[in-house]
From Swiss-Prot:
Protein's name according to its UniProt entry: Endothelin-converting enzyme 2
Entry's family note: Belongs to the peptidase M13 family.
List of glycosylated residues: 159, 163, 204, 264, 309, 376, 532, 625, 633
Active site: 601, 664 (proton donor)
Cofactor details (free text): Binds 1 zinc ion per subunit.
Parts of the chain on the Cytoplasmic side: 1-60
Length: 763
């Protein structure tokens, strides 16, 4: 799918919180588990005073009264001193604590009971104060933080004193500046793409074309310019032999976010109409005649609908053992003869020499077989139009404003966005991140990243890993052999924090982008050079073993991931910031924020897909049958639970989101257990002022407020049919309604919405 069609971010502000009085019910002084409270001290003092009074003279009573007053003053001083010294009975009044307390209070909705709807309780205030910005289909913590990171990068790249010893960093600035040259881009108009189409052999929609050029056009579009018509080809670690890279082929070729948009035509009629109008408008902008262009684009759309029909839904592709098929190129040729695979792959991976025996991993043999049949029965003119349309999709974001305006109309229908107000610089930062993300990351890390954060994050990961492994020991459904192997896998998980080391070594960084030519004069040509360069990088990887230095996210990215073939978890510098993490925030918030993210990624090693990989990152069956059956029974509970949730009357797909739901639930539990272990070692923290929450409760509020989010109905629908994650609301409600710790600390009775009675637990 075109990069520009991915979700757009935005900005907003927090709401001033009108304080509600929850303190009587949940004051840290009263609800702390098992400790003496201020009330109990007062009761004890009153009992002692009664014993002092009896039948005595007036003088004795006066003296006794004076003694009692003095004793009371002395005891008050002692109590005050004790409270001051004991952090569990004092309040944190540092500037950081006051600021974060204010933000938490602004986000809360105290008009809602936490046992009724914890998401609304935690995020209601935030939602009221954060309407969707224009041009955005969703707005959340991740978008806000990415906006902040982009502003930092803008400052770094536009600094007039910019001076770097790294050629890669200089290329990054040149690329960014070329993207900002709106006047030149407008002056060139559609000419750069029209010239490229003519160079490839023409397009039936805009002029003459070579009728015998299917393979040549396929090689150019999918090879030189890295579009993905019909299928996608890439080089990556072999899932069953993770120490080596291998050619991999998978299904692809749809422009809209999901096959559902093509096949459920009644529900998506507006989207399909808007998509066809978009196709026609771009065809006309490139020189086509309106009537002829509409007729031919309708044929291309019908071809995409046929592709959607044979595309396997994501929820049916979760078992990689079943969809992984290793074969030779000659076997692939027999499976899908419409493409000359040796010719195509040899071109794609030039200058490597490939033979018929070269191994290839195919994900979805049935799809490739059917797509081959579809190619063979489709008219050459339609095939040509479809191939060039894929090239057009790939490149129009580098053209003038007319193409962007056409896309905005499609985005409004598809995602519910209004006219975009995204400034050009922000678009250019995103493009630069896509093209030279690690060179950009070098600038970002040197300007912003605190090395101490990396050390603290390392410590947190180890604490969360230990907590997860303790949970393994408590599982009654897992046999000892599988349990031991699971613990070994958890021990072997490799963590990467902040950034790969090579980005701070100028020569190593320059080597990564060696061969990529960048000019400040032509943004379009820079993008073409990037596609060609990425194809060469892919070819270079095939004969090399996978490297841990190859990250799948840039350092400035606000996200994290687990990679099963390396058995590694990665946390870029971009996410190691508030509200996920801050060194001067309470540990309850850090464990509830970045700690849950860490636990989430670690648990992915043991979700329904990650569990298929062993500690070395190889896809193989290492579970005993009885434990596997028990695991599947537990995950079935979670699948059914999430399938009951609805957004705007539309149900979640509990199977599609299963892996992420397992990770959310397991990550929360591991992070909370790690927080409890930290408290046992270091003692209670000072509570935040005014929030009226124990630190245990604060952990869960911190977790929930990370997911405060607003979204258009159209974007919500898109998420339900494409996203492996549950919607933000149910990432909170689903996870916490399965947490015994949450239910205990908030006292939610069985039968309340947050405590339906049946808990689904996997890890």
């Amino acid at each position: 799918m075109n990069v520009a069609l991915h979700e757009l971010g935005g900005g907003g502000s927090m709401v001033e919180y009108k304080r509600a009085k929850l303190r009587d019910e949940e004051s840290p002084e009263i609800t702390v588990e098992g400790r003496a409270t201020r009330d109990s001290l007062e009761v004890g003092f009153q009992k002692r005073t009664r014993q002092l009074f009896g039948s005595h003279t007036q003088l004795e009573l006066v003296l006794a009264g004076l003694i009692l007053v003095l004793a009371a003053l002395l005891l008050g001083c002692l109590v005050a001193l004790w409270v001051h010294r004991d952090p569990a009975h004092s309040t944190c009044v540092t500037e950081a604590c006051i600021r974060v307390a204010g933000k938490i209070l602004e986000s809360l909705d105290r008009g809602v009971s936490p046992c009724q709807d914890f998401y609304q309780f935690s995020c209601g205030g935030w939602i009221r104060r954060n309407p969707l910005p224009n041009g955005r289909s969703r707005w959340n913590t991740f978008n806000s933080l990415w906006d902040q990171n982009q502003a930092i990068l803008k400052h770094l790249l536009e600094n007039t004193t910019f001076n770097s010893s790294s050629e890669a960093e200089r290329k990054t600035r040149s690329f960014y500046l070329s993207c900002l040259q709106s006047e030149r881009i407008e002056k060139l108009g559609a000419k750069p793409l029209r010239d490229l189409i003519d160079k490839i052999g023409g397009w039936n929609i805009t002029g003459p074309w070579d009728e015998d050029s299917f393979m040549d056009v396929l090689k150019a579009v999918a090879g030189t310019y890295r579009a993905t018509p019909f299928f996608t080809v890439y080089v990556s670690a072999d899932s069953k032999s993770s120490n080596s890279n291998i050619i991999q082929v998978d299904q692809s070729g749809l422009f809209l976010p999901s096959r559902d948009y093509y096949l459920n035509r009644t529900a998506n009629e507006k989207v399909l109409t808007a998509y066809l109008d978009y196709m026609v408008e771009l065809g006309v902008l490139l020189g086509g005649q309106p009537t002829s262009t509409r007729e031919q684009m309708q044929q291309v759309l019908e071809l995409e609908i046929q592709l959607a029909n044979i595309t396997v839904p994501q929820d049916q592709r979760r078992d990689e053992e079943k969809i992984y098929h290793k074969m030779s190129i000659s076997e692939l040729q027999a499976l899908a003869p419409a493409v000359d695979w040796l010719e195509f792959l040899s071109f794609l991976l030039s200058p490597l020499e490939l033979g018929d025996s070269e191994p290839v991993v195919v994900y979805g043999t049935e799809y490739l077989q059917q797509v081959s049949e579809l190619i063979n029965r489709t008219e050459p003119s339609i095939l040509n139009n479809y191939l060039i349309w894929n090239l057009v999709q790939k490149t129009t974001s580098s053209l003038d404003q007319r193409f962007e305006t056409a896309q905005e109309k499609l985005l409004e229908t598809l995602y519910g966005t209004k006219k975009s107000c995204t400034p050009r610089w922000q678009t250019c930062i995103s493009n630069t991140d896509d093209a030279l993300g690690f060179a950009l990351g070098s600038l970002f890390v040197k300007a912003t990243f605190d090395r101490q954060s990396k050390e603290i994050a390392e410590g947190m990961i180890n604490e969360i890993r230990s907590a997860f492994e303790e949970t393994l020991g408590d599982l009654v459904w897992m046999d000892e052999k599988t349990r031991l192997a699971a613990k070994e896998k958890a021990d072997a998980i490799y963590d990467m924090i902040g950034f790969p080391d090579f980005i701070l070594e100028p020569k190593e960084l320059d080597d990564v982008y060696d061969g990529y030519e960048v000019s400040e004069d032509s943004f379009f040509q820079n993008m073409l050079n990037l596609y060609n360069f990425s194809a060469k990088v892919m070819a270079d990887q095939l004969r090399k073993p996978p490297s841990r230095d190859q990250w799948s996210m840039t350092p400035q990215t606000v996200n994290a991931y687990y990679l099963p073939t390396k058995n590694e978890i990665v946390f870029p510098a971009g996410i190691l910031q508030a509200p996920f993490y801050a060194h001067n925030h309470p540990k309850a918030l850090n464990f509830g924020g970045i700690g849950v993210v860490m636990g989430h990624e670690l648990t992915h090693a043991f979700d329904d897909q990650g569990r298929e990989y062993d500690k070395e990152g190889n896809l193989r069956p290492w579970w005993q049958n009885e434990s596997l059956t028990a695991f599947q029974n537990h995950t079935a509970c979670m699948e059914e639970q999430y399938s009951q949730y609805q957004v705007n009357g539309e149900r979640l797909n509990g199977l599609q989101t299963l892996g992420e739901n397992i990770a959310d639930n397991g990550g929360l539990k591991a992070a909370y257990n790690a927080y409890k272990a930290w408290l046992r070692k270091h003692g209670e923290e000072q509570p935040l002022p005014a929030v009226g929450l124990t630190n245990h409760q604060l952990f869960f509020v911190g977790f929930a407020q990370v997911w405060c989010s607003v979204r258009t109905p159209e974007s919500s629908h898109e998420g339900l049919v494409t996203d492996p994650h549950s919607p933000a609301r149910f990432r909170v409600l689903g996870t916490l309604s399965n947490s015994r710790d949450f239910l205990r600390h908030f006292g939610c009775p069985v039968g309340s919405p947050m405590n339906p009675g049946q808990l689904c637990e996997v890890w």
